Amino acid sequence: MENRYTSNLAIDLGQIDYLECLKFQKDLVSRRLNNSIPDVLLFLEHPPVYTTGRRDDPSNYGSIDVIKTERGGDVTYHGPGQLVIYPILKIWEKEGKIDVRSFVVKLEGIVIKSLATFGFEASVGDEPGIWIGNGKEKKKVASMGLAIENGVSYHGISINIGKEVLEGFSRINPCGMDSSVMGYIEIDRDDLINALISVFSEEFGPFEMKSLTTLWKS
């Protein structure tokens, strides 16, 4: 099927139910696989929800209800005060194989570079995620959990941008760590989206912010 779009798309979904959004992601993955749409970035917030991935360890969330998914990683929390980014991207193949690790490193770099535009020095370390600070003041401010279907990515990145998100993490061991490691950074949501679009565009070609209806126009 012909891709009639002239650029990659960035779409702000506002707040959306987790399972509804997961269904939407999978539809976009199918459409990206047949080249009827370009690469798409979804920006959004979920109502409070706990999810877990392929490294699921029930000891990290006890009796809390969680949604089990096909993404990488262990249990995490999504809710108000967090910007979620789901990149529906066709990953380039290297020697006939999908280079997932290089893709993850690239996404980490995009988040780090975007945060740097606001004066935050973020980094990756031995533990999963993106961190700011040093020593006892070191806090995890962004998490990543991806799934790849036939070379197209979905699920993605969450960045904590409001203090209220920390309460949700306090009920679990996020990614197997004590919840006290979680932190947040105060950044205007729209400003952060614009910074991310700019850096994603440098890495994957230009993205333009469009309305949701753009995806359904004939």
Kindly give the residue locations of the regions a language model identified:
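Cytochrome P450 core scaffold surrounding the K-helix E-X-X-R motif
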Residues: 51-59, 163-176
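Compositionally biased, intrinsically disordered low-complexity regions enriched in proline and serine
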Residues: 6, 19, 78, 155, ...
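Conserved phosphate/anionic-ligand binding catalytic regions in large, soluble enzymes, centered on
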Residues: 150-163
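N-terminal lobe of the biotin/lipoate ligase/transferase fold
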Residues: 1-140, 148, 216-218
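Residue-level detector of alpha-helical segments with a strong bias toward transmembrane helices
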Residues: 89-91, 161, 166
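C-terminal accessory segment of soluble enzyme catalytic cores
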Residues: 147, 166-218
